[in-house]
Regions:
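Short, internal strand/loop/helix patches
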Residues: 111-158
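Thiol-/selenol-based redox modules, centered on thioredoxin-like
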Residues: 158-192
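Hydrophobic beta-strand anchors of alpha/beta hydrolase catalytic cores
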Residues: 63-64, 92, 156
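Short pre-active-site segment immediately N-terminal to redox-active cysteine/selenocysteine motifs
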Residues: 60-62, 66-70, 99, 152
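N-terminal targeting signals for export/organelle localization
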Residues: 1-42, 191-192
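Conserved redox-active cysteine motifs that mediate thiol-disulfide chemistry
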Residues: 66-83, 97
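A short beta-strand-turn-helix
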Residues: 41-63
Length: 192
């Protein structure tokens, strides 16, 4: 009797754990950064050699969107961000992430040339698809992405007035996500 019972209990436990895992949304990856200050960085902007730091956004609720011209999902979410930026007075800061990939011919060039190529590609892409960003910064080597725990692009963060990360979304932002989670959160943070 025990020989049949123990494997049967083990099997049912395994099925329960698998069912729980399959019902979770993979885009809702828990981030250890939620509730903690946004990692500091200082990167050059897409527009000029001026630099941007999250400290410049203290006192404002803002979105931080990690994107790349080579990212297919970024193309899907981009019209949503453009429409959101037109309707809302919320700053969106873009992080152009690893624009120069290792297999890219520009990867063998100097850092200055890589930056120039990345800026040109990003600027052309934003001209073609619209620019929802208050500013966009260049993360050529992906170090800032690592600090933010980026799993892949696109990723979007909501950061409050004190510079604390309040929300992280992995994957394309949809109108439904904006309406149901991001906008209510940002409005609530704006009142506090």
């Amino acid at each position: 009797m025990k020989k049949v019972f123990i494997p049967l209990v083990f099997f049912f436990c395994l099925v329960i754990f698998l069912a729980i895992g399959l019902n979770r949304d993979p885009r809702e990856i828990p981030s250890p950064l939620i509730g903690k200050p946004a990692p500091a960085f200082n990167l050059v902007t897409l527009e000029s050699d001026k630099t941007f730091s999250p400290e410049q956004m203290l006192g404002k609720v803002w979105m931080f969107n990690v994107w790349a011209t080579w990212c297919v999902a970024c193309r899907e979410e981009h019209p949503v961000l453009v429409a959101f930026a037109e309707k809302n007075q919320v700053p969106i800061v873009g992080l152009s992430y690893k624009e120069i990939q290792p297999q890219d011919p520009a990867a063998k060039q100097s850092d200055a040339i890589k930056l120039q190529v990345a800026r040109e590609r990003s600027a052309v892409w934003l001209q073609r698809h619209g620019n929802p960003y208050t500013t966009s910064v260049m993360d050529l080597d992906g170090r800032v992405g690592i600090q933010y725990g980026v799993y892949g692009v696109p990723e979007t963060y909501v950061i409050d007035q004190q510079g604390v990360i309040r929300f992280k979304h992995v994957g394309a932002v949809t109108p439904q996500l904006l309406a149901e989670k991001i906008l209510p959160l940002m409005q609530g943070l704006g009142k506090s």
